[in-house]
């Protein structure tokens, strides 16, 4: 079942505190604050209403000054998922929205079609949550614990059903490994259930929030896309993002 734009709310959680890159959402990329560039790309995806969810007035002001929507949330949320759930209640108290797409605010080069791809598993199957992955092509990523791997079983062309997420090199044996992309589309009821659950044992062990859903028996389907968008976590990443945007003429 295809979703209409009124069925979908795209939320971009953002906060100023960042240990490796303070003030990251407001860092200039291509002449815009990073959070504005992400919002611009989310709007270009054309899948539904877009808003930035933040606890920082400075971020909200920058987003609104650029013509996009922002909603203020509490400062004490333990995760972006909790922040977007609060924002959902503020923006859609009547429950009209069926799907919430969580786009990280540090992906200034993400392609709009990549955001759109996250909806497809929910449109075509019974999954509670959908997310994205790409085949690992760089040898070093196979053993890098900062690269989260999706362990999944194929359920169609460019589609996996997630069985596990791990920082380890898995699965073993011949075949591709998959680099998880932390963009999620939740059915509304799934997001509500997810944030109501306590952190799970494997979630705490791997430090991967999505394992809470799997341990609770929720189904996560994964769309395979061509490439992993650049996440900006360090000054070096920021310079690379600026170079990529400049080379693409923004």
From Swiss-Prot:
Keywords: Cytoplasm, Lipopolysaccharide biosynthesis, Nucleotidyltransferase, Transferase. It is found in: Cytoplasm. Pathway: Nucleotide-sugar biosynthesis; CMP-3-deoxy-D-manno-octulosonate biosynthesis; CMP-3-deoxy-D-manno-octulosonate from 3-deoxy-D-manno-octulosonate and CTP: step 1/1; Bacterial outer membrane biogenesis; lipopolysaccharide biosynthesis. GO terms for molecular function: 3-deoxy-manno-octulosonate cytidylyltransferase activity. The keyword Nucleotidyltransferase applies. It catalyses: 3-deoxy-alpha-D-manno-oct-2-ulosonate + CTP = CMP-3-deoxy-beta-D-manno-octulosonate + diphosphate. It is an enzyme of class 2 (transferase). Transmembrane segments: none annotated. The keyword Transmembrane does not apply. InterPro entries: Cytidylyl_trans, KdsB, Nucleotide-diphossugar_trans. It holds the Pfam family CTP_transf_3. One of its GO terms (biological process) is lipopolysaccharide biosynthetic process. GO terms for cellular component: cytosol. Its EC number is 2.7.7.38. Activates KDO (a required 8-carbon sugar) for incorporation into bacterial lipopolysaccharide in Gram-negative bacteria. NCBIfam families: kdsB, PRK05450.1-1, PRK05450.1-5. Belongs to the KdsB family. HAMAP family: KdsB (MF_00057). This is 3-deoxy-manno-octulosonate cytidylyltransferase.
